[in-house]
């Protein structure tokens, strides 16, 4: 009875992971050997605020869920923490910022963007891109610049007339 219950739990876990992996635009796999529970919880809290999932998953279950979700095949070994979400840039930034703080205990091992394997260097390059919010701010600044310059010009003209 106990084994049947455990098997059912694993089947449900794989089905749940599969449904989440299908929707994810990015999936990163990291080694977290030696990282304290407190620090892993801090990572989870940061991730949760950005809509990113963080979970330690048995490699065999993760492999099955990834395969069923259509991801390219990865050779999963040792202990892994899986991070996934819909924003590749935010996820990459989160992982590399955390890795800088904990370089001896947290290392990116593999990355998948849109279900295709990408190199660690590629993920690092993506982490250096501006976020969606930063890009929107830049665009807004470009759009408002002509009006800002026009108003500044009118103000300078008014000041020049007042001086004369």
UniProtKB/Swiss-Prot annotation:
Keyword NAD: no
Name listed for the protein in its UniProt record: Large ribosomal subunit protein uL10
Family stated for the protein in its record: Belongs to the universal ribosomal protein uL10 family.
Gene (name only): rplJ
Keywords: Ribonucleoprotein, Ribosomal protein, RNA-binding, rRNA-binding
Function, as annotated: Forms part of the ribosomal stalk, playing a central role in the interaction of the ribosome with GTP-bound translation factors.
GO BP annotations listed: translation
A Pfam family of this chain: Ribosomal_L10
GO molecular function, one term: structural constituent of ribosome
Listed Gene3D superfamilies: 3.30.70.1730
GO cellular component: large ribosomal subunit
NCBIfam families (alphabetical): PRK00099.1-1
Subunit structure of this chain's protein: Part of the ribosomal stalk of the 50S ribosomal subunit. The N-terminus interacts with L11 and the large rRNA to form the base of the stalk. The C-terminus forms an elongated spine to which L12 dimers bind in a sequential fashion forming a multimeric L10(L12)X complex.
């Amino acid at each position: 009875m106990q084994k049947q219950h455990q098997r059912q739990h694993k089947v449900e876990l794989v089905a749940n992971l599969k449904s989440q992996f299908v929707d994810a635009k990015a999936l990163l796999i990291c080694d977290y050997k030696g990282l304290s529970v407190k620090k892993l919880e801090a990572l989870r809290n940061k991730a949760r605020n950005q809509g990113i999932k963080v979970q330690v998953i048995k490699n065999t279950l993760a492999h099955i869920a990834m395969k069923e979700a259509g991801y390219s095949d990865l050779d999963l070994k040792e202990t892994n923490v899986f991070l996934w979400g819909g924003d590749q840039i935010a996820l990459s930034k989160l992982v590399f910022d955390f890795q800088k703080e904990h370089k001896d205990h947290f290392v990116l091992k593999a990355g998948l963007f849109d279900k295709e394997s990408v190199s660690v260097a590629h993920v690092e390059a993506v982490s250096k891109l501006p976020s969606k919010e930063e890009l929107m701010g830049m665009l807004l600044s470009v759009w408002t610049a002509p009006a800002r310059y026009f108003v500044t010009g009118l103000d300078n003209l008014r000041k020049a007339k007042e001086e004369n």
